[in-house]
Amino acid sequence: YDGEEGVCYHFTYGNALFIMLNSESMRSAEGLAAAQAWVRDVIKSNPAKYVVVMEHYQWFFGESGRTSQYGRWKDLFDECGVDLAIGANNHIYARTNAIYQGRETDGSKGTVYIQTPSSDNERGQGLKEWTDNKDLIKFRWTEGGSTVGAILLRADDSKLHLTLYDRNGNALDSVSVAAKR
């Protein structure tokens, strides 16, 4: 969208629409509104079996569970049927099951929110007391300051499958996101 060409973008890969957002341009209310209008239009104009939205900042703060970008995007994701939201930034893996209207669902509607862990062995951080969103966040993981983790995303006709691996290739968590279209 205007001023964000090459920074905010989208593409279709197989049967999934991927939307990438510029977190820095969304700090102001005007920037957030422009980004949300663009996301709404991209989803409407690019029908796909799965919709995945990615941005740099976390949906929840992994160390405590406190809400971060989730509060700014959840209503739009509910409205547009976003299947998977991937964020990062605080380098602690955190995952929800499908959430719709602020509550966990059976997966037939709602968005799964995931924060990716650190992958460079330098930017991890430790967990703190889990104070918020215990009903929404289903799994958290970090190795502390030297975290290395990776997420494998596979897709088939009925589900997206995500698996978290540690530095030694051990599977630590997995979630499947049901196709809703």
What is each PLM-predicted segment?
Residues 17, 159-162:
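Hydrophobic residues embedded in beta-strands of well-ordered beta-sheets
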Residues 1-47, 72, 76-78, 84, ...:
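Extended active-site neighborhood of metal-dependent phosphoesterases/phosphodiesterases
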Residues 56, 88-89:
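Active-site glycine-centered loops adjacent to acidic/histidine catalytic or metal-binding residues
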Residues 30-31, 63-67:
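Short, solvent-exposed loop/turn segments at secondary-structure boundaries
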Residues 178-180:
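Short beta-strand edge segments in extracellular beta-sheet folds
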Residues 169-171:
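Residue-level signal for glycine
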Residues 46-63:
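Short acidic, glycine-rich surface-loop motifs adjacent to enzyme active sites
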